[in-house]
Amino acid sequence: VATVQGLSGTGSLRNLGLYAERQIGMFSFTGLNK
């Protein structure tokens, strides 16, 4: 659901990064996004 909302929003990449970071935990997309 979070991913769908992210794609609908302007910050899709940001939301996907946060979601992926929670799921994976190993990678930090938010750090790369800074």
Curated annotation (Swiss-Prot):
GO terms for molecular function: L-aspartate:2-oxoglutarate aminotransferase activity. Keywords: Aminotransferase, Pyridoxal phosphate, Transferase. Its cofactor is pyridoxal 5'-phosphate. Its EC number is 2.6.1.1. It catalyses: L-aspartate + 2-oxoglutarate = oxaloacetate + L-glutamate. The keyword Transferase applies. It is an enzyme of class 2 (transferase). The keyword Transferase applies. Important for the metabolism of amino acids and Krebs-cycle related organic acids. In plants, it is involved in nitrogen metabolism and in aspects of carbon and energy metabolism. In eukaryotes there are cytoplasmic, mitochondrial and chloroplastic isozymes. Belongs to the class-I pyridoxal-phosphate-dependent aminotransferase family. Homodimer. This is Aspartate aminotransferase 2. It comes from Pseudotsuga menziesii (Douglas-fir).
